[in-house]
Amino acid sequence: MNLIQQLEKEQFDKLSANKTIPEFGPGDTVIVNVKVVEGERTRVQAYEGVCIGRSGGGINESFTVRKISYGEGVERVFPILSPMIDSIKVVRRGKVRRAKLYYLRQLRGKSARIVEKQDRQQAAAVNE
């Protein structure tokens, strides 16, 4: 392991020590609680949408969340280890076959829906 990788690993371990980052990927609906500074006050704002992709790795990893706000599509890119992110919560898991869901930008209404992924144990428990 070279010096740069070693330094990045140390920084990643230090930054992620006090954060819990859930496992999520493209197609998952997530709620990202973002710290917003207004003057001298700081408040937490929830940003809920579909993760349309993750990029980078280690300390440089980021993810893009897309939501529809008042009929207009809004995308926001969040660095995973950003100090402005208070928490990340996975609401539902989506069943997709792509790593980047950029095709959702052209879709409207029902065609833009993502099918929810079913857990095998959960489905077996429901059928019994």
UniProtKB/Swiss-Prot annotation:
It holds the Pfam family Ribosomal_L19. Belongs to the bacterial ribosomal protein bL19 family. The keyword Lipoprotein does not apply. GO terms for biological process: translation. The lineage of its organism: Bacteria, Pseudomonadati, Pseudomonadota, Alphaproteobacteria, Hyphomicrobiales. It comes from Bradyrhizobium sp. (strain ORS 278). This is Large ribosomal subunit protein bL19. This protein is located at the 30S-50S ribosomal subunit interface and may play a role in the structure and function of the aminoacyl-tRNA binding site. One of its GO terms (molecular function) is structural constituent of ribosome. Keywords: Ribonucleoprotein, Ribosomal protein. GO terms for cellular component: cytosolic large ribosomal subunit. The gene is rplS.
